[in-house]
Amino acid sequence: MRTEPRPPAPSPPSAAAGARAAHPHHAQVHPAVALQPARGVGGQAALFAAGRAGGDLPLQPQPGGAAARRQPAARAAQAFFPAAELAQAGPERQRDPAVASRGGQLHAAGGAGRVPERYP
């Protein structure tokens, strides 16, 4: 009867290996924690939803923001189309060369006293 030599028994873990395993940076993370998205769109959306539910984030624009500094559309249109402004003014204002020469568009359309129907 022949006996084969047994493989050597595994050596006990060394003190250094035990110290490495005990270090918090080397500790294994639980799989449920490791699978959660730490960053990205999904994580941010969940964060914002949680903030809105708690009332941390505003749902409406706040006064004094960018919308409050913006010019109304009617005023912005007058800066580009002075004829609309002149059409609302009286005839004495329409004949004023200082007003009619703004941008040179009214002079090209026929002079200081004439307001064009529309721009080309």
UniProtKB/Swiss-Prot annotation:
Keywords: Translation regulation. GO terms for biological process: negative regulation of translational initiation. Residues 1-30, 86-120 are annotated as: Disordered. Residues 1-13 have a biased composition (Pro residues). This protein is produced by a polycistronic gene which also produces the tumor suppressor gene SCRIB from an overlapping reading frame. Represses translation of the downstream SCRIB protein. Translation of oSCRIB hinders SCRIB translation but does not completely abolish it, probably due to leaky scanning which allows the ribosome to bypass the weaker oSCRIB start codon and initiate translation at the stronger SCRIB start codon. This is SCRIB overlapping open reading frame protein. It comes from Homo sapiens (Human).
